[in-house]
Design a protein with these regions (language model features):
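Domain-level signal for Mg2+-assisted phosphodiester chemistry and nucleotide/NA-binding surfaces
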Residues: 1-100, 121-124, 129-131
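Short alpha-helical
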Residues: 28, 58, 114-115, 138
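Acidic beta-strand-to-loop metal/phosphate-binding motif
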Residues: 52, 105-112, 119, 123, ...
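Short, glycine/polar-rich helix-capping loops at beta-to-alpha or helix-loop-helix junctions
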Residues: 59-64, 135-143
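Short, charged, surface-exposed secondary-structure boundary motifs
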Residues: 84-86, 140-145
Length: 147
């Protein structure tokens, strides 16, 4: 159930909610980011847009144009060891820093990774709405207030 504080806006209304959008590049494709941002815009203003991943890899070349066009700040996270997810840790640390800044009405977590369930629960405990968007290639993302 979506919180009554954060509901989709009509085109005639000004979005009032300030949202932090955090994207897990390890579990998203560049091709679906624009439809996801359009969906997020229905719920408020994405005042922070960050994406986390290792952008030095050849596989990440498709991100550059999308990030520039949509004013998304890349947060570089090297893979220091195999099997460890440094990207997840970096995203979670930033989310907690943003939470304690008290500048946001909600968070949008763009990932298909269930590792962020604990983060979503913690953000909700602070009274914030959490929108979980799964970045599938056919983008049938569900906007939810429970991650």
């Amino acid at each position: 159930m979506i919180s009554p504080r954060l509901v989709a806006k009509n085109d005639s209304e000004e979005p009032a909610s300030r949202l932090a959008v955090l994207i897990d590049a390890d579990n998203a494709q560049a091709a679906v980011i624009e439809p996801i941002l359009a969906e997020i815009a229905r719920y408020g203003e994405a005042t922070v847009r960050r994406i986390y991943g290792d952008f030095t890899s050849v596989a990440s070349a498709s991100w550059k144009r999308v990030l520039q066009k949509n004013a998304i700040k890349p947060i570089q996270q090297f893979a220091y060891t195999t099997g460890k997810n440094a990207t997840d840790s970096s995203l979670i640390i930033d989310a907690m820093d943003l939470l304690y800044s008290r500048k946001f009405d909600g968070f949008c977590l763009v990932t298909s990774d269930s590792d962020f369930t604990g983060l979503a629960m913690r953000l909700r405990e602070e009274g914030l709405t959490v929108l979980g968007l799964k970045p599938l290639m056919r983008f049938v993302a569900r906007v939810i207030d429970s991650y």
